[in-house]
């Protein structure tokens, strides 16, 4: 049985691909660095779209707020081009949000690796050396 795949999901997926290409190719703002679009959630009435992004090299800088500000200012430009490429009667308003799930995932992976390493240290320290 085929999995239900709604129109808003299809539009969101296509918007994700098209926005990634448009940002890479057309947006010339120096505040926009290496941006990855992780997801696009489109409302049921196609009036609004939440665009979730990550920014490479954001450690210790204000790159994320600057990138969000630049993308928000370029939103009308991006909507215009999306309308041409996707041939939609009404292009959703774009709302950009930072996707913290990637950084949270990296943090959790580091915690797990540290716990496993500590566990191995305790196991190695508790076992007598049987090799001769």
UniProtKB/Swiss-Prot annotation:
One GO MF term: ribosomal small subunit binding
One CC-aspect GO term: cytosol
Keyword terms, alphabetized: Cytoplasm, Ribosome biogenesis
Superkingdom field: Bacteria
Subcellular location: Cytoplasm
Cytoplasm as UniProt keyword: yes
GO biological process terms held by the UniProt record: maturation of SSU-rRNA
TM regions (residue ranges): none
Pfam families linked to this entry: RBFA
Statement: the UniProt record of this protein carries the keyword Lipid biosynthesis: no
Family matches, as InterPro entries: KH_dom-like_a/b (IPR015946), RbfA (IPR000238), RbfA_dom_sf (IPR023799), Ribosome-bd_factorA_CS (IPR020053)
PANTHER family: RIBOSOME-BINDING FACTOR A, CHLOROPLASTIC-RELATED
Subunit structure: Monomer. Binds 30S ribosomal subunits, but not 50S ribosomal subunits or 70S ribosomes.
Cited function: One of several proteins that assist in the late maturation steps of the functional core of the 30S ribosomal subunit. Associates with free 30S ribosomal subunits (but not with 30S subunits that are part of 70S ribosomes or polysomes). Required for efficient processing of 16S rRNA. May interact with the 5'-terminal helix region of 16S rRNA.
Family note: Belongs to the RbfA family.
Protein name: Ribosome-binding factor A
Organism, scientific name: Pseudomonas entomophila (strain L48)
Primary gene name: rbfA
């Amino acid at each position: 049985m085929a999995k239900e795949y709604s129109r808003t999901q299809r539009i969101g997926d296509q918007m994700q691909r098209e926005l990634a290409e448009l940002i890479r190719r057309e947006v010339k703002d120096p505040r926009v660095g290496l941006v990855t679009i992780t997801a696009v959630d489109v409302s049921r009435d196609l009036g609004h779209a939440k665009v979730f992004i990550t920014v490479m090299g954001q450690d210790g800088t204000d790159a994320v707020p600057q990138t969000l500000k630049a993308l928000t200012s370029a939103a009308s430009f991006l909507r215009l081009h999306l309308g041409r490429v996707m041939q939609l009667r009404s292009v959703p308003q774009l709302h950009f949000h930072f996707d913290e799930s990637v950084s949270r995932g990296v943090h959790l992976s580091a915690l797990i690796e540290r716990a496993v390493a500590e566990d191995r240290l305790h196991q190695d320290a508790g076992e007598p050396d049987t090799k001769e």
